[in-house]
Amino acid sequence: MEDLKKSVTNIVHSMYNFDCSEIVSLTRPPKPEYGDWALSLPLKLASLLKSPAIDIAQSIASALLELDGVQDVYVAKPGFINLKLSREHTTGIISEVLEQGSSFGRNTTQSSKKINLEFVSGNPTGPLHLAHTRWAAVGDSIARILINCGADVTREYYINNVGNQIHLFSESVYARALSKSLPKDGYPGEYVKDIARRIQCEFPNIIDLSYEDAIKIFRKRSWQIQIEEIKKSCIAFRVNFDVWFSEESLHEPDRFGKSQIDKALARCKQNGYLFQKNGAFFIRTTEFGDDKDRAVLRSDTSYTYYAADCAYYLNKINRGFSDLVILVGADHHGYVKRFQAMSNIFHVDSENNRKNVQVLLGQMVSLKNKRQSKREGNVIGLSEIIQSVGVDPLRFWFCRYPIDTPIDLDEQHLKKRSNDNPVYYVQYAYARTRSLIRSANLLQMEKFGFFPELLVHETETALVSLLYDYKTVVIDAARFLQPHRVVRYLESLAGAYHKWYDKCRIIPRKGILDKSEAELVNTRLELNRAVGQVLYNALDLIGVSAPERM
């Protein structure tokens, strides 16, 4: 489809000297008899070119008829174009899939980008919870899709190891080591006791130290041990971060006594966006749509979180990233304007160097029939939910929905081995393709050749059309940072495959009777192989396994 879109773009440019690349789109007609693709572009061009849509449609249609692979073009009022591709062109996708194998679907649409993708970034004060699990699945899948489209992607985890929560966490661990009650608003949970025991094993005499000396050790080791556990959980969930960035490093002075935060605020001052009010310092973020100017230095000379955010942003820019993508919870909606403000403030002298900053706001996740409370210490952690449900169902389910859609997770449903469980339905389709291939290998069917013109059943036409769609689905998923497009495609392809499997006997029960039947069987087996390959490739984009047997 992308090649066809490029052809349409070139036709319009040559006819009208107009670049329509941003508005051209191809869709599937509501009925197969209307053709393979529908184009509503003339309706959009009519007002732009000051010409009747039907006339534009007729002109474009005439040029489309000259393209290789286009069998017929129909124009309908007020300015729609329907295209029918030749049988050879559409079924050619089967050979393309089989020739390219695991590379099918890869492209270079994002090759000009060096992207920093920050996600999860849960505070190192406890295990990752359900919402973090969602960000892990979605963030890693976005990375996989972008890499598939040629981008240079760095997966990054920001460790919030500075501030009151870290202090309270270390105090909680220290209290558990002394078998004392928790401080006010302290952290409950068995994991706090586990960390306390581990620190005591590392430093056997720590409880004999003064509070001042002991708390220094607890402050450092508590979050470090928790991060070690978080790393293990992420790896078990098939998420591997390239960079674990410590917020603490932003506060550390260089040999001249200046921290990265100091340098970032100096840059803000140099560009005219830093001002003082009531003894504190603020950045003029309201000039870029924020609801209020953000404090960066309090009157007691301590830095705010936004000061560290500014330094972290500048750190990413200095590492050469062209695009910054940040996944946060919906409760961080204010981050959008703040990060956009940074992009303007730090690049005021150069419009061309302004960075593309995208903040993706994700809705929360609830667990059906289970109440969770972090303060009560009964939050469901990533490791626990993996043990209960498994990696594949979780990753599939979390990527199945747009990130701004709340999810109510049903553990029992995800454990079902039935067709009403989407991940089982898709994986079972792949396992079926592999089972047929094993059976075909015993029959040595390859010698009978491949004749795509034999694929005339309506279920085969539907399958071929879906194979044809795959590359565009991947390109759009990367462009819009939406893994759910891949998941929904997988469900459509699996559904079409199961329907084909049930309607068409691929390998006859009574054996192959003659040469013509053998040719049809082998041709269908090639379609089967192509579907299996695309299922495998798409599952890999969301980090879900493709089982050989089920």
Curated annotation (Swiss-Prot):
The EC code for this enzyme is: 6.1.1.19
Q: Keywords in UniProt for this one?
A: Aminoacyl-tRNA synthetase, ATP-binding, Cytoplasm, Ligase, Nucleotide-binding, Protein biosynthesis
- Tell me where the sequence motif 'HIGH' region sits in this chain: 122-132
One Pfam family this sequence matches: Arg_tRNA_synt_N
Which InterPro entries does its entry note?
A: Arg-tRNA-ligase, Arg-tRNA-synth_N, Arg-tRNA-synth_N_sf, ArgRS_core, DALR_anticod-bd, Rossmann-like_a/b/a_fold, tRNAsynth_Ia_anticodon-bd
Q: Which GO terms describe its molecular function?
A: arginine-tRNA ligase activity; ATP binding
Q: Where is it localised? A: Cytoplasm
What is this enzyme's catalytic activity, as reactions?
A: tRNA(Arg) + L-arginine + ATP = L-arginyl-tRNA(Arg) + AMP + diphosphate
GO biological process, alphabetically ordered: arginyl-tRNA aminoacylation
Query: Which leading EC class covers this enzyme?
Result: ligase
For this UniProt entry, what's an example GO CC term?
cytoplasm
Q: Which family does it belong to?
A: Belongs to the class-I aminoacyl-tRNA synthetase family.
Q: What HAMAP family does the record point to?
A: Arg_tRNA_synth
Quaternary assembly: Monomer.
Q: Which PANTHER family match?
A: ARGININE--TRNA LIGASE, CYTOPLASMIC (PTHR11956:SF5), ARGINYL-TRNA SYNTHETASE (PTHR11956)
Protein name per UniProt: Arginine--tRNA ligase
